[in-house]
Amino acid sequence: MDFEHIPVLFNETVNSLEIKPDGLYVDCTAGGGGHSHAVAQRLSDKGRLIAIDRDPEAIEVLKTRFASFPNVEIVHDTFDNISAILNGRKADGIMADLGVSSHQIDTAERGFSFHMDAPLDMRMSKEGKSAADVVNTYSENELYRIIRDYGEERYAKSIAKNIVRERENKRISTTFELCDIIKMSMPQRAMRDSHPARRTFQAIRIEVNGELTKLDSALDDMFSSLKVGGILSVITFHSLEDRMVKKRFASFCEGCTCPKEFPVCVCGKTPRGELTVKGVAASDEELSRNPRSRSARLRSIKKIKDD
């Protein structure tokens, strides 16, 4: 199976982990194995890599790609289960690329792309509710909230209203059917700079896969799963994710919270983390090779104190 995916911020991410040859590393979103392969090549026989992905197609590709790597463990699961996967082990480095893979976008039948007509699916794991289920069963208020909050779409109200109106006549089953509804819901001037469906498709994909609801607690678990001196590196692709990661990382670095007028600290809080990479974006060279890296941001944090 071909699982074409160009890893973004490749060197920046791998270098951010400060890889130790004998260390334990986790790729929470291994995909086609680009970042994972670079890590595995830097490990000794004593080192170990755990490559996790929720997509069964990715898992099959990873099994083939790492068949000759006895120290690479392939796990079909979601990153919010990292504590159970590690089962008490502590990692020297953990990475997560939160974007949809190129394979998922370019495989029409997965239903992620608004550029190809296909069944409305958008499931990363091929399990649970699909995009069609969301579009055809959620109330107008629920759709409005999702499109507004997860897509930051200014025309969310009219899009939600038209979705509900159109589905009364016929079930909305394909990506292009949804695109047509979105286009009729906004003025022409709103379609000049980018595809009109981009924000709504993002919102529905986030809802289908529970991306943001799982992320906040998963970041806590990832950080807790590090050894002291271990590094967590996360790549985000939209502002909602990036703000969440930035805020969570800041909380790990927070020290004393006593009022300024207190002569001495009584709360006992000291920083648990130290920021090592602060929102690095793709270079001009990478953008020319891979335009999809435009919105990618890398943030890294080193654990300096145990929980």
Predicted region positions:
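S-adenosyl-L-methionine-dependent methyltransferase catalytic core, i.e., the SAM/SAH-binding region
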Residues: 1-307
